[in-house]
Swiss-Prot record:
Protein name: Nuclear receptor subfamily 1 group D member 2
Record lineage: Eukaryota, Metazoa, Chordata, Craniata, Vertebrata
Modified residues (Phosphoserine): S46
Region (Interaction with ZNHIT1): 397-579
Domain called NR LBD: residue spans: 369-579
Signal sequence coordinates: none
GO biological process: cell differentiation; circadian behavior; energy homeostasis; hormone-mediated signaling pathway; intracellular receptor signaling pathway; lipid homeostasis; negative regulation of DNA-templated transcription; negative regulation of inflammatory response
Superkingdom in the source lineage: Eukaryota
Pfam families: Hormone_recep, zf-C4
Gene3D superfamilies: Erythroid Transcription Factor GATA-1, subunit A, Retinoid X Receptor
Family membership noted in the UniProt record: Belongs to the nuclear hormone receptor family. NR1 subfamily.
Length: 579
């Protein structure tokens, strides 16, 4: 199936409305101020889930109770008073359905929606000054664990600034200022519409193609198989794909999900690990500055790279389909096809790993690396380990960079789709609900999967190309809060030392969430979710009988993932608007 460029990024919003991801932030943060009044919402979306389906702190107890929470569907607007029923009084107090909204940083009365969250005037001004003046605050004397409240918010400025970032205040919102309302609405409507169309096309295509394959296999069955009564066939199909209940032990659920996870994810990871030993990049190594140094000869295997890439017959066939494009193979088994600055990825399902990678020239000891890394004309970087490289060619347009970044997700997204289809009971959901779950949860699944790419001990991040970069190098390229938050999440998740089985079940729980926006048959999704959570609980209790807190810690990772999803959405939007 042909995938449109940029289509794999549309999981950043599962809402059909023209809405800004930057206006939606997760309430699921243990740093959020919620203690003053449990009945007062701190978001314009006064519901158990925002547009991306983010659970709030108050829902964590319900999540442990197999997520028996209420849901209210809300839609975002592009203006500051984004939710229906939200008003702003003459005194500057923001209210929602008659209830006063509180500042997410200090708990004071919020004056409005500032820099991505509801905040008071004090915290709004504090955050703006901190960013604009690049203030370095005095080190906290309490290990950066100060509790920020209205009465003591000026006591520790470092912790206050940290709290601003943790609840979702956006540096970019301060840096870029305001976009005219009409222009912002036009851009958002245009972008969201295109993203939704392409995403629906991609996910629906994956699911429909799988259905066609199954139909073809069924027609190829022996005659005696085709002549069997339909009710019997239907009964067996239902039995094999329905959510396991009393007929299936929880151990069988665990086994099925673990096999699905291993077959779709772990193989590629092992390939990457095996190749990393022989192709370990040196510190400071980089992608070639000018990709045009390779000969674009259309008549040779690898399109001018035959001297470096010995190719098989299947690879020759692949190159014939994409004639006129450079094809480079990276250690994780993905072939990057470069054509006129655009990238397309092909996973191991399409091509064999039979090509060696061209050695990449590194920096000399005396070369000024920072001047090279930052010489992009002041443009933004998409420094995200889910792209093939943090390097941004200064000669490429923002549109080209966006397409490259989008297409780098294609193999990973396809693996998520394949994993989802093998979760017992997932295929029984309506195709509409399957697509919505995949759109809303793909980034979070990838975040769990790629947590192993973050090495807290070495302070390095491995990108999808298989190359490692130090955190300091990435910061010099423009990496900011998103990378820091991803690193922090990965460090905490890796610290739990989950087994393959536990990671598989947790990944399934992350994907199948009944509180996602746009779900039609909530009861069916909730039943499947309940089955998976019970299986995860059983597995954790079995493997860690003396560490019951691990299950709770895993559930607490769900709102953290929602926050990361929103931050990622905001960064993508900021890049799209200001490349």
């Amino acid at each position: 199936m042909e995938v449109n460029a940029g289509g794999v990024i549309a999981y950043i919003s599962s809402s059909s409305s023209a809405s800004s991801p930057a206006s939606c932030h997760s309430e699921g943060s243990e740093n959020s101020f919620q203690s003053s009044s449990s009945s007062v919402p701190s978001s314009p979306n006064s519901s158990n889930s925002d547009t991306n389906g983010n659970p709030k702190n108050g829902d964590l107890a319900n999540i442990e109770g197999i997520l028996k929470n209420d849901r209210i569907d809300c839609s975002m607007k592009t203006s500051k008073s984004s939710a229906p029923g939200m008003t702003k009084s003459h005194s500057g107090v923001t209210k929602f359905s008659g209830m006063v909204l509180l500042c997410k940083v200090c708990g004071d009365v919020a004056s409005g929606f500032h820099y991505g969250v509801h905040a008071c005037e004090g915290c709004k001004g504090f955050f703006r000054r901190s960013i604009q003046q690049n203030i370095q605050y005095k080190k906290c004397l309490k290990n950066e664990n100060c509790s920020i409240m209205r009465m003591n918010r000026n006591r520790c400025q470092q912790c206050r600034f940290k709290k601003c970032l943790s609840v979702g205040m956006s540096r970019d919102a301060v840096r870029f200022g305001r976009i005219p309302k009409r222009e912002k609405q036009r851009m958002l409507i245009e972008m969201q519409s295109a993203m939704k169309t392409m995403m629906n096309s991609q996910f629906s295509g994956h699911l429909q193609n799988d259905t066609l394959v199954e139909h073809h296999e069924q027609t190829a069955l022996p005659a005696q198989e085709q002549l069997r009564p339909k009710p019997q066939l239907e009964q067996e199909n239902i039995k094999s794909s329905s959510p396991p209940s009393s007929d299936f032990a929880k151990e069988e659920v665990i086994g099925m999900v673990t096999r699905a996870h291993k077959d779709t994810f772990m193989y590629n990871q092992e390939q990457q690990e095996n190749s990393a030993e022989s192709m370990q990049p040196q510190r400071g190594e980089r992608i070639p500055k000018n990709m045009e140094q390779y000969n674009l000869n259309h008549d040779h295997c690898g399109n001018g790279l035959s001297s470096h890439f010995p190719c098989s017959e299947s690879q020759q066939h692949l190159n014939g389909q994409f004639k006129g494009r450079n094809i480079m193979h990276y250690p994780n088994g993905h072939a990057i096809c470069i054509a006129n600055g655009h990238c397309m990825n092909f996973s191991n399902a399409y091509t064999q790993r039979v090509c060696d990678r061209v050695p990449i020239d590194g920096f000399s000891q005396n070369e000024n690396k920072n001047s090279y890394l930052c010489n992009t004309g002041g443009r933004m970087h998409l420094v995200c380990p889910m792209s093939k490289s943090p390097y941004v060619d200064p000669h490429k347009s923002g549109h080209e960079i966006w397409e490259e970044f989008s297409m780098s997700f294609t193999p990973a997204v396809k693996e998520v789709v394949e994993f989802a289809k093998r979760i017992p009971g997932f295929r029984d959901l309506s195709q509409h609900d399957q697509v919505n779950l995949l759109k809303a949860g793909t980034f979070e699944v990838l975040m769990v999967r790629f947590a192993s790419l973050f090495d807290a001990k070495e302070r390095t991040v491995t990108f999808l190309s298989g190359k490692k970069y130090s955190v300091d190098d990435l910061h010099s390229m423009g990496a900011g809060d998103l990378l820091n938050s991803m690193f922090e999440f990965s460090e905490k998740l890796n610290a739990l030392q989950l087994s393959d089985e536990e990671m598989s079940l947790f990944t399934a729980v992350v994907l199948v969430s009944a509180d996602r926006s746009g779900i039609e048959n909530v009861n069916s999704v909730e039943a499947l979710q309940e089955t998976l959570i019970r299986a995860l609980r059983t597995l954790i209790m079995k493997n860690h009988p003396n560490e019951a807190s691990i299950f709770t810690k895993l559930l607490l990772k769900l709102p953290d993932l929602r926050s990361l999803n929103n931050m990622h959405s905001e960064e993508l939007l900021a890049f799209k608007v200001h490349p």
